[in-house]
Amino acid sequence: MTDKLIIFDTTLRDGEQSPGASMTRDEKLRIARQLERLRVDVIEAGFAASSNGDFESVQAIARAVKDSTVCSLARANDRDIARAAEALKEANRARIHTFIATSALHMEKKLRMTPEQVLEQARQAVRFARNLVEDIEFSPEDGYRSDPDFLCRVIETVIAEGATTINVPDTVGYAIPELYGNFIKNLRERIPNSDKAIWSVHCHNDLGMAVANSLAGVKIGGARQVECTINGLGERAGNCSLEEVVMAVKTRRDYFGLDVGIDTQHIVAASRMVSQTTGFVVQPNKAVVGANAFAHASGIHQDGVLKARDTYEIMRAEDVGWSANKIVLGKLSGRNAFKQRLQELGVQLESEGEINVAFAKFKELADRKSEIFDEDILALVSDESVTSEKEQFGFVSLAQHSETGERPEATIVFTVDGKEVRSSAEGNGPVDASMKAIEAHVRSGAEMVLYSVNAISGSTESQGEVTVRLQSAGRVVNGVGADPDIVVASAKAYLSALNKLQSKAERVAAQG
């Protein structure tokens, strides 16, 4: 009988720490539902004590998710742990993930605590958490760079206090696969009660080895949980990629001898949803979910695949959710067909009202574009105006005038707290003019640090997906907008970023 590998997804917590990847509550809820559809074992929904916004997100996900365990991060103190437990109280299965740094560098420079103080705080934190929920995960932050003798003492102590999962993170992505695997193995062999907990790995990708290190922790170290994110999203160079580690274990079951419960046919839908929500475009050559992952340009490769797919393909594209028939709907498609396709794509809107709004936008798009692709639909439902979440700024219409040799002018109509306003401005181009028209009224003072355009599908009538990254007062957010008209898409993206900037400011104010 094979062991099961537990998949712990932290897209909504650690993934959101990517600069600009800030998500609203409703966006997190949609992704959580997709993760549940993917059959992720544990969803780390956020850090409940960090802000009122994060608390509400964790609480909403705990209420909505029925099959996956819902987890909240908490520092090793009573306030954080109690706040996490409160946010999780309506979850079918709840987990508190508490942590404290154990490396000499972190204890001295960041915590300013002695090892004995850290040991005692870890003990008290797990004891307190165990009285609130049964499922407790403990992480020694910067565990891989910690003194092994001290780490053994800490882990033995927290297991004795009731920790059910021990996660050993490579917090800064410093590890090498063989060394990391043996590090986990040695800890498990040295700690007398190590068999009383499930061992977990959490690897960052600073040296490009997050997946390799995680797999070494499983194969060599005996870990049975991997912490990962969709598309490898995460701060700095990112985290271990869920799709890569899952497909590695499934494709090389002969080597790993493990089962995973993931429904892999929903992987691509999850990847697209996270990409379009955060504005982080998946690189074409990304393993499993990149546009070129199953493409063969070489004539020799193409000939081999046509004769026998397994000559050059080690897994089937359809097994991870790639569809051979990419054209799905048109202007004659009805509401039921649209609703069914949403379900097939893993999209679950909150209410019939939201479906009606989304369908109206679909019909509007179908009148302008003859072929509607899956990517078009996902971009459409990612639009903030589809969801019930309150938005301060909303796009209404845009008119532009541009002639060779003259400065373009744009006039935009948009809503501010539900009231329509009209603003005009000139710019160096129509996109610049439209954004200056918005700023002429809003006066946010935000600095644009990124502007990018991505064609959603391959034709000339494709929707353009625009990502705008704004920075203000130390806050960085991404806004995403899609439309066949690039200027309109740009205006939508700018307004989306302003909404997130406002939301993040409110969360910071609430936290303060």
Swiss-Prot record:
<dbReference type="GO" id="GO:0030145">
    <property type="term" value="F:manganese ion binding"/>
</dbReference>
<comment type="subunit">
    <text>Homodimer.</text>
</comment>
<comment type="function">
    <text>Catalyzes the condensation of the acetyl group of acetyl-CoA with 3-methyl-2-oxobutanoate (2-ketoisovalerate) to form 3-carboxy-3-hydroxy-4-methylpentanoate (2-isopropylmalate).</text>
</comment>
<dbReference type="InterPro" id="IPR005671">
    <property type="entry name" value="LeuA_bact_synth"/>
</dbReference>
<dbReference type="Pfam" id="PF08502">
    <property type="entry name" value="LeuA_dimer"/>
</dbReference>
<dbReference type="GO" id="GO:0009098">
    <property type="term" value="P:L-leucine biosynthetic process"/>
</dbReference>
<dbReference type="InterPro" id="IPR000891">
    <property type="entry name" value="PYR_CT"/>
</dbReference>
<dbReference type="GO" id="GO:0005829">
    <property type="term" value="C:cytosol"/>
</dbReference>
<feature type="binding site">
    <location>
        <position position="14"/>
    </location>
    <ligand>
        <name>Mn(2+)</name>
    </ligand>
</feature>
<dbReference type="Pfam" id="PF00682">
    <property type="entry name" value="HMGL-like"/>
</dbReference>
<comment type="similarity">
    <text>Belongs to the alpha-IPM synthase/homocitrate synthase family. LeuA type 1 subfamily.</text>
</comment>
<dbReference type="InterPro" id="IPR050073">
    <property type="entry name" value="2-IPM_HCS-like"/>
</dbReference>
<keyword id="KW-0432">Leucine biosynthesis</keyword>
<dbReference type="InterPro" id="IPR013785">
    <property type="entry name" value="Aldolase_TIM"/>
</dbReference>
<feature type="binding site">
    <location>
        <position position="204"/>
    </location>
    <ligand>
        <name>Mn(2+)</name>
    </ligand>
</feature>
<dbReference type="GO" id="GO:0003852">
    <property type="term" value="F:2-isopropylmalate synthase activity"/>
</dbReference>
<keyword id="KW-0464">Manganese</keyword>
<dbReference type="InterPro" id="IPR002034">
    <property type="entry name" value="AIPM/Hcit_synth_CS"/>
</dbReference>
<keyword id="KW-0963">Cytoplasm</keyword>
<feature type="region of interest" description="Regulatory domain">
    <location>
        <begin position="394"/>
        <end position="512"/>
    </location>
</feature>
<feature type="binding site">
    <location>
        <position position="202"/>
    </location>
    <ligand>
        <name>Mn(2+)</name>
    </ligand>
</feature>
<feature type="domain" description="Pyruvate carboxyltransferase">
    <location>
        <begin position="5"/>
        <end position="268"/>
    </location>
</feature>
<protein>
    <recommendedName>
        <fullName>2-isopropylmalate synthase</fullName>
        <ecNumber>2.3.3.13</ecNumber>
    </recommendedName>
</protein>
<feature type="binding site">
    <location>
        <position position="239"/>
    </location>
    <ligand>
        <name>Mn(2+)</name>
    </ligand>
</feature>
<keyword id="KW-0479">Metal-binding</keyword>
<dbReference type="Pfam" id="PF22617">
    <property type="entry name" value="HCS_D2"/>
</dbReference>
<keyword id="KW-0028">Amino-acid biosynthesis</keyword>
<comment type="pathway">
    <text>Amino-acid biosynthesis; L-leucine biosynthesis; L-leucine from 3-methyl-2-oxobutanoate: step 1/4.</text>
</comment>
<dbReference type="InterPro" id="IPR054691">
    <property type="entry name" value="LeuA/HCS_post-cat"/>
</dbReference>
<keyword id="KW-0808">Transferase</keyword>
<dbReference type="InterPro" id="IPR013709">
    <property type="entry name" value="2-isopropylmalate_synth_dimer"/>
</dbReference>
<dbReference type="GO" id="GO:0003985">
    <property type="term" value="F:acetyl-CoA C-acetyltransferase activity"/>
</dbReference>
<dbReference type="InterPro" id="IPR036230">
    <property type="entry name" value="LeuA_allosteric_dom_sf"/>
</dbReference>
<keyword id="KW-0100">Branched-chain amino acid biosynthesis</keyword>
